[in-house]
């Protein structure tokens, strides 16, 4: 709690001196490291063996888990936790609140764990490409989009950011089927563009009900 309070005081002063922002980020990241395991494979095991309400509720998929366990020593050695300090205060807090995988509402991943999870999930058994991707992301050359960060390694590996849909039919059934599809996409962090040009115009006749469309 003292670390959190200190970081909040520091960030409140950064408009007076920009170095307070650096101090705040170092405090919150150091605090997170104190409260989490450094071993990527141990974190993976916790996520895989998670139990909710006395029922197995694995947060990662079995294929991903077995790949990690098979190569855990080389993967653990590749993680560089110091690179977490490349994130600024606001960037880290965004990861902490929304992106790092949680157990019982508490983030247990470190930022480097998240980046390695993404790299290994994308490149599967090709460790060389996975490590190259991890190196690029951890050194801030690029980062993947939100759905990839959310879903990599999970039981719902949906990586796409954007979906373009059209109303499946100009009817109550067609409209609500399309809205259901939109809800499922949104559930896993996909963005949606929806075309409704095939819906009848306002004041058009509705034969099924002998009514008039509201448009």
Question: How does the language model describe each region?
Answer:
Residues 1-215:
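Extended catalytic cores of very large enzyme megasubunits
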């Amino acid at each position: 709690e003292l670390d959190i309070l200190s970081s909040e005081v520091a960030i409140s002063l950064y408009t007076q001196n920009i170095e307070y922002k650096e101090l705040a980020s170092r405090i919150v990241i150091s605090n997170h490291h104190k409260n989490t395991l450094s071993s990527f494979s141990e974190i993976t095991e916790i996520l895989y063996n998670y139990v909710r309400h006395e029922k197995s509720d694995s947060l990662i998929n079995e294929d991903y888990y077995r790949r990690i366990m098979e190569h855990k020593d080389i993967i653990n050695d590749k993680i560089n936790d110091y690179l977490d300090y490349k994130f600024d205060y606001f960037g880290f807090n965004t990861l902490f609140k929304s992106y790092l995988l949680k157990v019982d509402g508490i983030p247990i991943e470190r930022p480097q764990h998240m980046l390695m999870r993404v790299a290994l999930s994308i490149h599967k058994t090709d460790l060389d490409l996975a490590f190259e991707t991890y190196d690029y992301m951890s050194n801030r050359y690029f980062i993947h989009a939100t759905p990839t960060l959310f879903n990599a390694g999970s039981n719902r590996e949906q990586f796409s950011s954007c979906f373009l849909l059209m109303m499946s039919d100009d009817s109550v059934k067609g409209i609500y089927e399309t809205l259901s599809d939109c809800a499922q996409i949104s559930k896993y962090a996909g963005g949606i563009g929806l075309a409704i040009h095939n819906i009848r115009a306002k004041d058009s006749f509705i034969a099924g009900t002998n009514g008039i469309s509201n448009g």
